[in-house]
Amino acid sequence: SYIAFKLVEDNPEKVGTKAYGYEKAEEIAAAVAAKKEKESRQGGLDLATARKTPSYWLMWGGLAISSFPGVAFRFYNGAFFRGPIGLDTVTYSNWASVLSVCIAVGMILMGVMADKIGSVKMVVLMHVISIAGYACAIVLMKNTGSFALLLITVILCGMNGPLDNATAPYLIPEAFGRKYYDEIIGSYAGAMMIGNVCVPMLLGNIISDGTAASFGLAWEIIIGFSAVAMVILLVGLFRGPYRKQYLALKAEESQMKKSGAEV
């Protein structure tokens, strides 16, 4: 048209140039395409398919049981420290603050460890920490004057607080892939609430008298549950239908990063 002709005639230097911001739009489009391509390569099982595998139900049960240690100490640490350990209200309040910090540290530590040492070692290490924490709590009742043992007990038992919530996000992609991660982890929410229901019913009558003997029995039961949860989770993870593909893709990504760093 005449208008288009005049624009070209008056601004010949702009013919063939791209609009302002075009390069940024190209970068965004390339990033989106790369993300979609990566997701398609990662793949994974949808929820309906995952539920048909033994791995799904093993991990469901493992996560449910692994919630017991954290729930037990959150619910009964007050009765424990003010009962058999003999802390007064003010001293206990100070230690409760330390316990909360340890819970947060435990969540951060689990995230770092999963990236550095892998899911299998993380599961083993965190459950060993849980078992060690409750073992220290049992010994502490025979050595109530030991500040060092009290500190170690609070740190270890605090770190096992997020055992189930912080473990699931790393186990699920490895077992079932990342593609349907959101819907699969949502289906595990019920498992991670089992401890809130079962632990009070299980331990309430045992520690009703608040004695060292009753707490010792309760903590021994929790140690047993922690060991069982670790084994079940590892079996479920090793039987994960997508684990081989996940590890192969992760190794490929690691190799690409190394190659990029060398360049």
Region roles according to the model:
Residues 87-96, 146, 150, 181, ...:
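Juxtamembrane helix-start elements in MFS-like secondary transporters
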Residues 175-211:
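A late C-terminal transmembrane helix in Major Facilitator Superfamily
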Residues 97-171:
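C-terminal transmembrane helical hairpin of 12-TM major facilitator-type secondary transporters
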Residues 1-33, 230-238:
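C-terminal membrane-cytosol helix-exit motif in multi-pass small-molecule transporters
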Residues 2-8, 223-256:
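Multi-pass alpha-helical transporter architecture, strongest
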Residues 205-226:
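A membrane-interface helix-boundary motif in multi-pass transporters
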Residues 46-110, 169, 199-203:
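Extracytoplasmic gate region of multi-pass secondary transporters
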Residues 64, 97-101, 128, 186-194:
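Transmembrane alpha-helical cores of Major Facilitator Superfamily
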